[in-house]
Amino acid sequence: MSASPKNEMWVVFKRLMAYVVPMKAMFIMAVLGLITYGAVDAAFIAFIKPFIDEGFSQTPAIVAGVDLPTHGGFNANKDIMLMAPIAVILMFSLRGVANFVSTYCVSYMSAQLIMDMRQQVFEHYLRLPVSYIDRENSGNLISRVTFDTEQIARASGSALISIVRDSMTAIGMLGIMFYYSWKLSLCILVIGPIMGVVISVVSKRFRKVSKQIQSAMGGVTATTEQMIKGHKNVLVFGGQKTEVERFFQVNDRNRYQNMKLAVAQSISQPLIMVIGSFALAFVLYAATWDSMKTDLTAGTFAAILGAMLAMLQPIKNLTRVNAEFQRGIAACTTVFELLDTAPEPDNGVFSIDRVEGKLAFDNVTFAYPGQEKSALNGINFEVKPGKTVALVGRSGSGKSTIASLITRFYGDLSTGDIRLDDTSIYDYQLKSLRNQVALVSQQVTLFNDTIANNIAYAYPGEVTREQIVHAAELAYAMEFIDTLPEGLDTQVGENGVLLSGGQRQRIAIARAMLRDAPVLILDEATSALDTESEKAIQKGLDNLRHNRTSIVIAHRLSTIESADEILVIDQGKIVERGNHSELIAQAGIYANLYQMQFSQ
């Protein structure tokens, strides 16, 4: 049985408060400041009764049970009138100090909480399996770090201020009313449950709509990100109108969800005020009763009336901030669901500095998560240390899947095993396993940094300038790097947008060379190069593959003629195998592909 919404909210709130525990000193100071702020407001209203009853009367004044002395011709009511300005200045000075302390402490906690939560979400992304990232909307993933954490900050910040301060003020005002006339104040007990029902119903609505707003905001982020990444394609294919319409739809959906929240909020606040007005009207009416007149003085009535009026604003604030609080709770639920997602399994215990590089696939069958059809069926091959195996086949045949399984990017196999140096890759610690592999894929990823830092990214320790230059030379990247004004210190832009496709590919190859891993995966590593560059860099790749176990995925068959073994993959199965000469002699799929490429 699932937990009720109220219990779920309480569980989420307690988990959120766990982030505040390291800042308990700040939290205590903030609460004390908020309580003081509310108490001063209550004290100011409480001061109305003695000010009116005693300050304007001709009888000795008693304030806080103490007879005020008379002196120098000034009677008691004169002393009350002299005390009032001083009391007001002192109270509001204390109120100002309390407001500063509480606001600063809450702002500090909110900023720290949002930083800690964003850091935790970001780090958790790095531990999640590739399959999770594949199936999730990138806009939603980004929204978790940006939009959702902002909503949480509001719940922990402005909502906390209002809940503590306004609750304290409302309780203080209620206490004053019952202290001065419990009979006249009983009407509050009648409207209290009605207000509670309204707030409960509205809270559920706020929480539901808030989750819909988060989803809509994820759509806005995803659509914007997609347009920016495909900006050139949008322009060249004239897709501006399509993109504008697509963004309008997600943008309008986000507006609609926000309006649903605004409607609920705009209805709830006046409704609370109307309910409160009935209580106020009842007090005014009850004050005319003969039974009440004997207990009421002008000061008592003014204090009760002032307390009721002063209590309406905190109640209104609590209703208003309830929307922010529910949005924060909804965002917390989404973020905590993400943080509760199981990280990439890492049950291996075996660790090694460097393997020899013997790689074997033993009857491997694999299906992607959520897919019934197997991507690979009964794959068997072995690569001896320092040897090269090339994978050839149509797009979608399973070549990249084989490469992804070597690094354990995806979960367990359906059948079979993959061994590295006669040890199952699932027995290795993930970090140790991936330290043995260098990868150059057809989708080059460069970071918004210098060329030098992008090349050095894959190196596990400190790297010298000479090592970076040497790797770039082997990748034939120095040819274009030397022509740049800042050389290796040139900024490449986001994902290398300031470089050509071939230049980005060479930097990626230089990065793999610098890593110096015993196992090398080249997934269409020369696909973005022109013919002249391909011939030049092929020499560098031949040097890179020397004494390294290499898995080469290629469509250009000219780049794999020297491979020790070539596997032809079709529909997840190995349909042909052998070296270049043997496969040509077989006159099968490989021979046909080779003939087609070289006849063009």
Swiss-Prot record:
This protein's name: ATP-dependent lipid A-core flippase
Upper taxonomic lineage: Bacteria, Pseudomonadati, Pseudomonadota, Gammaproteobacteria, Alteromonadales
Oligomer and partners: Homodimer.
Keywords: ATP-binding, Cell inner membrane, Cell membrane, Lipid transport, Membrane, Nucleotide-binding, Translocase, Transmembrane, Transmembrane helix, Transport
Domain ABC transporter: 359-596
Species whose genome carries this gene: Shewanella frigidimarina (strain NCIMB 400)
Top enzyme class: translocase
Role: Involved in lipopolysaccharide (LPS) biosynthesis. Translocates lipid A-core from the inner to the outer leaflet of the inner membrane. Transmembrane domains (TMD) form a pore in the inner membrane and the ATP-binding domain (NBD) is responsible for energy generation.
Superkingdom to which the source organism belongs: Bacteria
Coiled-coil annotated residue ranges, if any: none
